[in-house]
Amino acid sequence: MSAWRYAGGPSMSDLPLFPLHTVLFPGMMLPLHVFEERYKRMIGACLDDDRRFGVVLIRSGEEVGGSAEPHDVGTIARITGVGRLEEGRMNLLTVGEERFRIVRLSQQEPYLVGEVERISDVHEHFFELEEPAERVAALFAEYYRLTTLMRGGWQRAINLPRDPDRLAYLVAAQLQAPAAVKQSLLEMTSLRKRLEREVDLLGVAIPTLTELLQSARRQRHTGFGVLN
């Protein structure tokens, strides 16, 4: 197996890493603007040989300049589109694939390279997932409605995936939560527990959003009254 090339087995060889202040989930899209020389070199190599790279949340440090310490668990990113700009800069569109865990880090290249192993969820029967998945879908539909109203947008029907795994990753990606919370969802190896955690998070977020929306409406009405 060539370096950096994913073969779909239980393990992988060395993988170039892109530390970000963002969590990428499997099946989700992530646009990237590449401008640092080290990452232009890394992405250039990936494009030349149809290789993947790993997106990892930064534990400490910054995205630009110097070295950042990443979390141990990240997601393989596959490049699906590239726009080349001046001075070798690039706009990328990527999609998350498998999750991985870093076993060992290397700084032999200008960028981080990790020896990684693939991780997956434990096997769980569908009947264990059906009830929490239905609750997540119902709660997220309301959460989506409220966040759309908060932005002043139109209330459009949302078409959620029926597959519990895809649903959990979609909700995790769309949830307005700290990166550390999203990272904890990524690291879970039980889909049922991931769904149950999302039920808890949505259950807290929805009343907060409802109150914020009602408060904004009261302020608008009060303002209109003063003007009149």
Name every feature range the model reports, one short phrase each.
Residues 2-228:
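N-terminal low-complexity, acidic/polar interaction/targeting segments
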